[in-house]
Regions:
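Beta-strand elements of repeat-based all-beta scaffolds
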Residues: 1-225
């Protein structure tokens, strides 16, 4: 659920002794005394530690943790986009959000929210960075989970679009990636093309229509030579 650093640091032996024959159960909580804004109870504080630094927090199953974000929750809430995958009503058993805290300012953190289709494929991620800027990525997947296309918007702290990126992938009948087209602000920037040998290993890669080209050879062990 979460990771944190405690000072003074304890030896592995001390930690094993402290946790021996103990069962810690954490659950969602609307209020708690430690780390406001985390969204979980906190029952595994180590004894004799006088300072704690929260590092990461993970959320699962649903999106009830978004209340933590207050007014920013509207930017992180799911929004459908035409031509891209739709989020399924249930995310049971899936990672739905992460918080990663700034090591220099423990009051700041980046948060990412994950949305999935009915097959468990990620179809949308919405991130607020430590700087306050946002990054939204939309994806369309095939039945095998391969990403057919994605579109990423980079927004400033006020929600204004600054840069957009789009990626389109093509696969062969075996599900191997054969081509990727990448564009910035709807202007084609570069493309990659891939070929494979009879064993399914990549044999060549070209960029920008062959402007840059690489071939791969393998020995009997399957290592690139």
């Amino acid at each position: 659920l979460y990771t944190y650093e405690a000072n003074p640091l304890r030896s592995p032996g001390d930690l094993r002794q402290y946790c021996k024959e103990k069962l810690f159960v954490e659950e969602r909580a609307d209020s708690y005394t430690a780390w406001p804004g985390m969204g979980y109870t906190l029952r595994i504080l180590l004894p004799a530690a006088n300072d704690y630094r929260l590092l990461t927090v993970n959320y699962y199953d649903d999106y009830s943790f978004l209340y933590i974000e207050g007014t920013a929750a509207s930017q992180l809430a799911y929004r459908s986009k035409e031509g891209y995958g739709a989020a399924y009503s249930s995310a049971k058993g899936l990672l739905t959000g992460t918080q990663v805290f700034d090591l220099t300012d423990r009051s700041k953190y980046a948060i990412t929210v994950y949305y999935y289709d009915e097959y468990g494929n990620p179809v949308q991620t919405r991130t607020r960075h430590v700087s306050g800027d946002y990054e939204m990525t939309y994806a369309q997947c095939d039945l095998s989970g391969n990403i057919l296309k994605s579109y990423t918007e980079h927004l400033d702290s006020r929600g204004r679009l600054s840069v957009s990126e789009s990626v389109e992938n093509t696969y062969d009948r075996s599900g191997r990636l054969t081509r990727t087209d990448y564009a910035v602000n709807d202007s084609l920037s570069t493309d990659w093309r891939y070929e494979y040998d009879e064993l399914g290993r990549i044999s060549s890669k070209s960029i920008d229509g062959g402007l840059t080209h690489a071939k791969y050879r393998y020995n009997l062990q399957g290592w690139i030579t």
